[in-house]
Amino acid sequence: MTQTKRNDFVQWFCYLFLLAFLASCEQENKDHLTPIFDGATLTGWHTLGGEANYRVENGEIIGTTVANTPNTFLVTDSTYTDFILELDFKTDSVSNSGVQIRSNSHDWYRNGMVHGYQVEIDPSDRAWSGGIYDEKRRKWLHPLADNPPAQKAYKPNDWNHFRIEAIGDTLKTWINGVPASHLVDEMTDKGFIGLQVHSIGKRGKPGVDITWRNIELITENVEQYLQASPLPAIVTKNQLTFEEKRGGWQLLWDGRTTEGWRGAKINEFPEEGWEINSGELSVLATGGGESTAGGDIVTKEMYANFEVKVDFKITEGANSGIKYYVDTELNKGEGSSIGLEYQILDDKKHPDAKLGNHEGSRTVASLYDLIQADPKKHMNPIGEWNTAHIISKDNKVEHWLNGVKVLQYERGSDEFLKLVGESKYKDWPNFGLYEKGNILLQDHGDLVSFKNIKIKTYGEAEQ
């Protein structure tokens, strides 16, 4: 045997060995998959949302589009945290759909609207099947705009296969064996699995089928069966999502440094009382005093019309706040700088929740000492993250908590001026009426952490 033939033989043998090894790994993986659809009934599943129809035929779940109804979801009765999900699906050339993972339906969130991660089924020319969309929350997190191999992997009008891994904060997807998405996101770690029949609007076609089969899970010893992905991870922590970039949002904090921020009463960032660690900006516990340690911090820039979002996490009994339209020149003495405040508070343990010149106006998400947030608001437990969202355009202001609007008001209105006149701010001239001001994170001497601090501004032409 010549050297060339020997090399060819070795290469061929190695190739066959690799194929056999991969096949054995795939078979071992399949041996540990457990069906969550019995092939005959919809036992273990229920519908949420709209009124699209689901039925079982020939071992397949078939969802059918219906006119004049919102998105419909067939979801598992059980919820899952870490898992590997494999399934087959088929749709026509126009009907968008998706597979929900770690999704939820809570009474407090938009009257039970299904929300959470969706692995997209996209038969359009865009071909983003396998991308990760955040249903009824943040929209696109990992589209396939920069992944042509995954786009080409989708087979129109034919059966396709998804592999989906959800482990900790990491989500990975494959379509027909081709890596599609690799996302690192901390928002939701548990929820149901769901099969979507998308609403079709006025122009869509009713009676179109979307079909799924071989829906199987691994939930035990999941780490043993993970597959490596060559795709670089899209990390959302302290970064702008795809949709945020398209929508004109900017980072207000870079997740690493103090750039863009200073002390409210000094020109530099405080040397003590604040800490940056693992992508979190924390005001430290120093005894519960108002601005007595490091002091409040503010943006160096001032803002007029804007939206700002801040993820915050409190400790037991903690007090803090997000202030806006702040004038740092107003109060150079003791205490916090003056501005409108989105209250951050442990309502159950901090006495401030029962104080104030207007009932309930010092509870979490309220306009501090002026307007109470909706008492039915949902606050995640101590130690978990919550999202504050403040919208201020043309003096019309809204406070949102965890995706739900909890109050609104108009700066400068008769009602607003009356509330100010009855509050602790009655002696501050033009309180809350400035055209623009700083945004502030409050030091109230309790441990509170912040991340994902983002802003969207509106210019004169957009007002």
Predicted regions span which residues?
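Bacterial Sec-dependent N-terminal signal peptides
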Residues: 1-31
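Carbohydrate-interacting regions of secretory-pathway proteins
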Residues: 25-463
